[in-house]
Amino acid sequence: MSARFADAFWPPADELAEAAGRIRARLGDWPRGAAPWRLCLAAPELPADGDVLIVSSGDRAGQARASAVSRPASPDAVAIEFDERSAVLHAAGARHALDAAHPLADDWIAALAAFIDCGFAPLDALVLALAWRDGDETLDGDPWPVDAARFPRIAGLPAAPEPAFAPCPARLGLYPVVPDADWVERVLDCGARTVQLRVKGAPPELLRREIARAVAAGRRYPDARVFINDHWQIAADEDAYGVHLGQEDLETADLAAIARAGLRLGLSSHGYYEMLRALHERPSYLALGPVFATATKAVVAPPQGLARIARYARFASARAPLVAIGGVGLEALPAVLATGVGSVAVVSAVTGAADYRAALVALQQCFAGEFDNR
C-alpha cells in the first residue's frame, strides 16, 4: 500500500491508496497542502477537520448527510454526491453541481485524492478528477488533464450571452491597474496600451467623472484599451472599451446588456472551477491569479504560484486571452510570462514605484524582450 495515502481514506482502502499513489507519482512535484484531509466513503466514527464525505446517488442516508453540509451551519464540512456522469460538492453552505463529459473513471476517487495531495482545494481537485480517465497515469508524456473536451461543465448555468463579447488581442501586453483617471492618463502617456481603472469607495458623482475621464484618455490613443473595474453600467454609458468583473459579479451583472453594448469583458478566476464558470460566458479575456501574495486587494484565494498558473494556461489558452495578476513585479515578470500567458497585470509595481516612468519603461522592455525570444 502507498504509505503517502495510508491515512487518506476512511474506512482504510488499500486498493484506493495504491491507485492514488500511482496517479500522484505522475503528477509532478507539488507542495502538499497544509490543511489536513481525508476522503470518507462511509460516515467516520470520529469526524475530523478536513473530512470529505463521498456518497453515491443511491445512498439515501448518505445523500441526507451530504445535503446537510450545504447548510450554513456546517461551514467547514465538505461532501460529494456522485453518479455515473455527475458529481455535486457541498461546502460552506453552497452546492456546486458538475456534469462530466464522459462516465466517471473507476479511479476518479483515487485521482481526487492525488489532486488534493497536490494542494488543490476539494472543488478544484474534483474538477480535475472528473476530467481524469482510467489509465492516464500509464501514458507516455504528461498525464495532467488539459483537453477542454474532457472537463466537466457546471450544471444549471444559463446560456452564454448573445451576441458574444467583443474580442481582445491574444496578447494584451503590460496591463497596469490604477486607482484613478490621473493614473490612467500617466500610464497611457508612458506607452502602456492596456489599462484598468479600479476606483474603490468613491461617491457616485466622482465615480462617474473618473470613469468618463479615463475613457476619454483612452480615446486619445487609437490603440488604447481602457477597462473599467466593476461599474459596467457607467462603462456602457461612457462607451468604454471594456469592463472587468470578479466571480462574485457574475450573479448580479447583466452580462447580456454588457455584450449588447459592445464592451469587452474580462473575468477573474482563482482555480479550475472558477475558470469553468468564467469560460462558460466566453469572455474577451480571462484573468488568472493571484500569482503571488498581494496587499493591493483583498483576495480570498491563496497565491497560486507559477506552477499552477502554467497549468491553468495550458488548459485555457486556446479558449481566451490570458492575463496573470497578483503581486507581480519586474523581477518575477519573465517567469510569469514563461507560463504561457499573453498579458500580466501590475499594480504596485507601477503605482508604488519611486519613479513610475522608469518602472513602466523597464516593464515594457521586459515584455518586448520575452515576446521577441519566443
Language-model-detected regions and their locations in the chain:
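Glycine-enriched alpha-helix->loop->beta-strand junction motifs that scaffold or abut catalytic
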Residues: 51, 74-77, 189-194, 237-243, ...
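Short, small-residue alpha-helix embedded
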Residues: 101-122, 126
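Alpha-helix-loop-beta-strand connector modules within alpha/beta enzyme cores
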Residues: 208-230, 247, 255-270, 301-330, ...
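Hydrophobic faces of well-ordered beta-strands that scaffold small-molecule active sites
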Residues: 40, 53-54, 67, 170-178, ...
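Conserved phosphate-donor
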Residues: 53-100
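Charged C-terminal helix
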Residues: 1-49, 58, 123-170, 369
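Catalytic cores of alpha/beta
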Residues: 226-241, 270-284, 314-323, 328-346, ...
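Glycine-rich phosphate-binding active-site loops on the catalytic face of alpha/beta enzymes
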Residues: 118-121, 136-140, 193, 198-200, ...
